[in-house]
Amino acid sequence: MARPIDVSQLIAGINKKKGLDENTSGKISKPRFLNKQERSKQERLKENEESLTPTQSDSAKVEIKKVNSRDDSFFNETNDKKRNPSKQNGSKFHFSWNESEDTLSGYDPIVSTRAIDLLWKGKTPKNAAESSYMGKHWTEKSLHEMNERDWRILKEDYAIVTKGGTVENPLRNWEELNIIPRDLLRVIIQELRFPSPTPIQRITIPNVCNMKQYRDFLGVASTGSGKTLAFVIPILIKMSRSPPRPPSLKIIDGPKALILAPTRELVQQIQKETQKVTKIWSKESNYDCKVISIVGGHSLEEISFSLSEGCDILVATPGRLIDSLENHLLVMKQVETLVLDEADKMIDLGFEDQVTNILTKVDINADSAVNRQTLMFTATMTPVIEKIAAGYMQKPVYATIGVETGSEPLIQQVVEYADNDEDKFKKLKPIVAKYDPPIIIFINYKQTADWLAEKFQKETNMKVTILHGSKSQEQREHSLQLFRTNKVQIMIATNVAARGLDIPNVSLVVNFQISKKMDDYIHRIGRTGRAANEGTAVSFVSAAEDESLIRELYKYVRKHDPLNSNIFSEAVKNKYNVGKQLSNEIIY
């Protein structure tokens, strides 16, 4: 067995490979300990050697050239002008050796800090990561790309809440689902200039016009939300799917659509808006659609004459419609669509029996082949409305608009205290002077309306008109015309007229006498703050009000404050002891 190699021979072989001196290659030197001065001297010598001898990595960096970089001529040109030409070719550092030995003189790194990089720094959108994770917004997607989450966001955006089994998704725009005929589409977008549907229109039209199954519909939405067009468009769509009828057949079968509304003013407003659409649509489609209204104030002879050539759409108040049916002025065999507009107001005005009577008559007189569709619209959902819906509607779709706070009308509510009518008028004069017309003042009694109009005539320069139930139909229409054409600045009206008014841009609503019910209060102040405009509602409270109503009013004013500007007078709080109990509940 061979003897193992000596350690000295192994070390000598390693040193030989490294090119060390042969005299020391075979010797093992004993470690020698250095003092502090010797160690410092050795470190300085080592640093000088490293600085004078470029490493392999440094040499590689010198040879690398910058390629395919962005064009920085604009930024570099500016920086070059600021440099001192005499120093551009000089060394960056001054050492004891020659400049030719400076290894950094030609150093041009491929990566450097540039002005353009500094400008672009931080320009990445903050929500870039969120967008890449969550995906595109529903407005950026096509219809087939929409998923359940997108439809849910769309409903949240427009404050649409639905229930009632399978409910169709809302319209994203007028054209996409091809529900509306092209000729009617041109009327809506080009002639009437409605670029996009309102929330109530978005959810009503696809659910009412679903050809697979005509379902009943109950919509809860505030006034001024576009409800009229929401039911007029489906009526016209359904009519366009059948051939036009001659006048003789219209007389024999009666109207195709029946629209009930609580007041004369609202009936006439619906007729006017519907005729605005049908007049243009008739020219586009050659479909002669006749719209007739039946309201109180017109004699039976006048109604009989207007119905002599039949009609396609009938708009009526419940009482006058029953009179016409009992006098055999019309028949209702072919009513395909029945609309109850402002259903809660009809109930408030005592029309519940008349409404149910009409619904029964329509069902009894209808031909067996007619599949009637019932649409109901209301601003508030009450037990009576629910009872009617349960009794006369078949598995309806329920849709509520404006549940979210952000969709509330932009109304500032101000509640002031006044001892009597004289005190109210004294406080009212400077208020109305601050607002542009039109202005609506609501009162509870006709005598107050006449007294208030006389006060304005004597003590101000403002022109006023009066609207209440004692006026004849011609007087009411004349008053509304004066108000709509800005010939008078203020209209004094009772609750009866509150629902039927459709006056745009009302800047101020005054409750000179607070209403007896909260529903009426809500409908009154709803005359302003419409179509995303801001409005103001001022209410005067005296010492003779119902305490429960004032407590309810206080809660409503505190809860519905979209502008964060509501004012509830301390005098009213102290008089009716409201606000204190709520504070105690919060504290304890």
UniProtKB/Swiss-Prot annotation:
Protein name: Pre-mRNA-splicing ATP-dependent RNA helicase PRP28
Mutagenesis or variant effect for T223I: In PRP28-117; no growth at 15 degrees Celsius
GO CC list: catalytic step 2 spliceosome; cytoplasm; nucleus; spliceosomal complex; U4/U6 x U5 tri-snRNP complex; U5 snRNP
Matching SMART domains: DEXDc (SM00487), HELICc (SM00490)
Tree of life domain: Eukaryota
Region of interest (Disordered), residue spans: 15-94
Effect ascribed to mutating T317I: In PRP28-36; slow growth at 30 degrees Celsius, and no growth at 15 and 37 degrees Celsius
EC number: 3.6.4.13
Signal peptide positions on this chain: none
Effect on the protein of changing E265Q: In PRP28-99; no growth at 15 and 37 degrees Celsius
UniProt GO molecular function: ATP binding; ATP hydrolysis activity; first spliceosomal transesterification activity; mRNA binding; RNA binding; RNA helicase activity
Assembly, per entry: Component of the U5 snRNP complex, composed of at least BRR2, PRP8, PRP28, DIB1, LIN1, SMB1, SMD1, SMD2, SMD3, SME1, SMX2, SMX3, and SNU114, associated with the U5 snRNA.
The UniProt record lists the keyword Cytoplasm: yes
Catalyzed reactions: ATP + H2O = ADP + phosphate + H(+)
GO biological process: mRNA 5'-splice site recognition; mRNA splicing, via spliceosome
Domain (Helicase ATP-binding) ranges: 208-399
Phenotype upon changing N584E: In PRP28-56; no growth at 37 degrees Celsius
Location of the motif DEAD box: 341-344
Impact when changing R499K: No growth at 15 degrees Celsius
Ranges where the Helicase C-terminal domain occurs: 427-579
